[in-house]
Amino acid sequence: MTKEFHHITVLLHETVDMLDIKPDGIYVDATLGGAGHSSYLLSKLNDNGHLYCFDQDQKAIDNAQVFLKSYVDRGMVTFIKANFRHLKSELNALGVTEIDGILYDLGVSSPQLDERERGFSYKQDAPLDMRMDSDAALTAYHVVNDYPFQDLVRIFFKYGEDKFSKQIARKIEQARAIKPIETTAELAEIIKSAKPAKELKKKGHPAKQIFQAIRIEVNDELGAADESIQEAMTMLALNGRISVITFHSLEDRLTKQLFKEASTVDVPKGIPFIPEDMQPKFELVTRKPILPSQEELLANNRAHSAKLRVARKVRM
């Protein structure tokens, strides 16, 4: 891993081991990032196995080309620069119609957070950006300066779950009427000014939830995850598995709901047994989410909110 792309992988062994890797299987890392999961997964494959890696960030792919060079040279890995919401079409274009397993590590990678100019963090001043794909049109600047008041309130409530969403949206509206809000530091100060003093004394940065909400809006993170996970589940082979790491309640709720829908069936009253064609296609490998160990939490502070859920395809 290059110094420019340093990333500590969360729930490394649990996420990959839960896929029950077949050495000659076809696998997908839907969120390449720092390539930690990819590296460990590739170590379990033989030369007949293959891993397809998705990332919107060209820097992540460039880093992985170097970090995974030995596997690249053996023709065991293919990199795809695309949003994982296009999973099925991108894989189909490469002749892949069925996969043995897939993993997702949702959220922002550490290098994106740490790279000041990407504008993800409220901890350092930078232009408002927050794009995971630097070629995308919509930026945080556009959301903050151009979205109507009601749209700001909606995304702050929906994606940030911040009870002061209206007050924050009003402060933003007032500030941008004077001059555009251009940097993360400016926005963080406006958010702080909208919250009562007792809120500012609470643990955690007062801007965290609003920054999360804007980031989710800019990248349509939940919409993309919903589409991609559903596509992945249709592409899994029999006994294929899907591992999903989430970092906040919205992602976890979405994953839990998708897995529940795929692993349960509503039986109409009066039917004594469930016909085979109505049986659920998936079963939960994890009834409750797997959490990082105490050792991992001590080594990596960013692992604190991580949850891993896994499901297995039991019927086609």
Curated annotation (Swiss-Prot):
Presence of keyword Cytoplasm: yes
Reaction(s) catalysed (UniProt annotation): cytidine(1402) in 16S rRNA + S-adenosyl-L-methionine = N(4)-methylcytidine(1402) in 16S rRNA + S-adenosyl-L-homocysteine + H(+)
Keyword Transferase among UniProt keywords: yes
GO process annotations (BP): rRNA base methylation
GO molecular function, one term: rRNA (cytosine-N4-)-methyltransferase activity
Family membership: Belongs to the methyltransferase superfamily. RsmH family.
Function: Specifically methylates the N4 position of cytidine in position 1402 (C1402) of 16S rRNA.
Name under which the protein is recorded: Ribosomal RNA small subunit methyltransferase H
Gene name of the record: rsmH
